[in-house]
Amino acid sequence: MAKIIAFDEDARRGLERGLNILADTVKVTLGPGGCNVVLEKKWGAPTITNDGVSIAKEIELDDPYEKIGAELVKEVAKKTDDVAGDGTTTATVLAQALVKEGLRNVAAGADPISLKRGIEKAVEAVTAELVGNAKEVESKAQIAATASISAGDTTIGDIIAEAIDKVGKEGVVTVEESNTFGTELELTEGMRFDKGFLSQYFVTDQDRQEAVFEDAYILIANQKISSIKDLLPIVDKVIQANKQLLIIAEDVDGEALATLIVNKIRGIFKSVAVKAPGFGDRRKAMLQDIAILTGGQVISEEVGLKLENVTLDLLGKARKVVITKDETTIVEGAGDPDQIAGRVAQIRGEIDNSDSDYDREKLQERLAKLAGGVAVIKAGAATEVELKERKHRIEDAVRNAKAAVEEGIVAGGGVALIQAGKLAFEKLSLEGDEATGANIVKVAIEAPMKQIAINAGMEPGVVVARVRELPLGHGLNAATGEYVDMLIAGINDPVKVTRSALQNAASIAGLFLTTEAVVADKPEKAAPVAAEPGAGMDF
């Protein structure tokens, strides 16, 4: 395909136009006075959202240079969303301000490389102050405040705080669509996986259609079990111990399954068989998780263990197991806490080293099942459009709240950036174009607060000047127009979100400023539409 090339100022200005179109669309959503953006979909109902990354993803521009500029800023929003779960609009506004100031200085003759170095040093200094000013999240109320700001709804904030309080910071909080109105919270006790009993005959509670065993043994086998001959030795030992048995295996069928069912119906021996969760290597890993949680061993010929040689000490144990037709829950496994902690640390290391979003999500689920728990927030609404928007808002707020628990919180509303900047620039000593680069950051970090003020119908310059003189942590509550202690008023942001937004915006701004040429695909001319046969003829 033929290419078109732009150089110097033309190249940079083309990219900036694309950035501005995208940023101007996204920034109307910032702050309590921000509005929504409607996104048309080719199929189904349109989406209404105030989430920066969702809006950015939908924007496609015709001009090839503008398109590249917009794509670069999409990357800022996406990276911030991936790392922190929120702050996408703030990151976009910061990127726009940094690029605007930076290009003005490049056009005036400043050295782009020195500007980039100055920007990087200033961002590092501001980030250090932000992290230093962060306060640990100590109460459920603080989590609720953070989530409420992200979701724009105190009820959602309270539910998320309740969920995180119950499952802990390693736990998983998922959001599902509900058929009812309102928002509900469902908590899972213990480890749960999505495989149920292999036969209805295993049910012990007919009313609830569940198999419930107290103080049960658990056989964990990474193989298919078809012959009862393999199972009999361990079944006899469990019967002698007067216990019940949960069998988790690749599959249980044929003679083995039939014999277990007959013994259950006759009241000789209570057991239940379920398929192992997952596939391939993930199944092996999950079986090992279950073994460590329950203090058992995975029975597999790979490690030299045969079913007929299994003894009771190789079985896992749990205070309670509950099995339905769709899922299995293991409550209070008898595993060694040190081994569980070691497994948790191993999975956490795998999460840090994984490049795949899907793998990270699955590892996070495994981690939660071992270390915390699982909470499901069920979101309902009157229409499909409202339901999608509400679900998305809750998902963002959950990630925001988890980021707050992870690294702490700072004053919200753009206040933390301005006040961290004030402290950082007093200590920073740079010269020449590096000092100019630092000054670009000094100007740009005011942009989020200015935009919040504009969206709330206030004068941005006056607001920023006033906040700069206030004590640390005090700023504008844009919802009421009052100047307050932001943390006491419950207006806070996770420091991870604010830090990531600034760092990612600065990274893209540096690329913009040091660009000397842009190579883009030449737009193809649309093919002429063929006339319909017989058009314009009388018959």
Curated annotation (Swiss-Prot):
One biological-process term from Gene Ontology? protein refolding
Query: One Gene Ontology cellular component annotation?
Result: cytoplasm
CDD domains associated with the record: GroEL
Write out the entry's keywords from A to Z.
Answer: ATP-binding, Chaperone, Cytoplasm, Isomerase, Nucleotide-binding
Instruction: Name its cellular compartments.
Output: Cytoplasm
The UniProt record lists the EC number as 5.6.1.7
Question: Where, in this chain's numbering, is ATP bound?
Answer: T29, L30, G31, P32, D86, G87, T88, T89, T90, G413, N477, A478, A479, D493
Q: Which GO terms describe its molecular function?
A: ATP binding; ATP-dependent protein folding chaperone; isomerase activity; unfolded protein binding
EC top class named in words? isomerase
- List the catalytic activities from the record: ATP + H2O + a folded polypeptide = ADP + phosphate + an unfolded polypeptide
Question: Where this protein primarily resides, as one coarse class?
Answer: cytoplasm
Which superkingdom heads the taxonomic lineage of this protein's source? Bacteria
Tell me, what's a Pfam family for it? Cpn60_TCP1
Q: What does this protein do?
A: Together with its co-chaperonin GroES, plays an essential role in assisting protein folding. The GroEL-GroES system forms a nano-cage that allows encapsulation of the non-native substrate proteins and provides a physical environment optimized to promote and accelerate protein folding.
Which family does the similarity line name? Answer: Belongs to the chaperonin (HSP60) family.
NCBIfam families named among the record's database cross-references: GroEL, PRK00013.1, PRK12849.1, PRK12850.1, PRK12851.1
Tell me how this protein assembles: Forms a cylinder of 14 subunits composed of two heptameric rings stacked back-to-back. Interacts with the co-chaperonin GroES.
The protein here is known as: Chaperonin GroEL
Q: What is the species listed in this Swiss-Prot or TrEMBL entry?
A: Leifsonia xyli subsp. xyli (strain CTCB07)
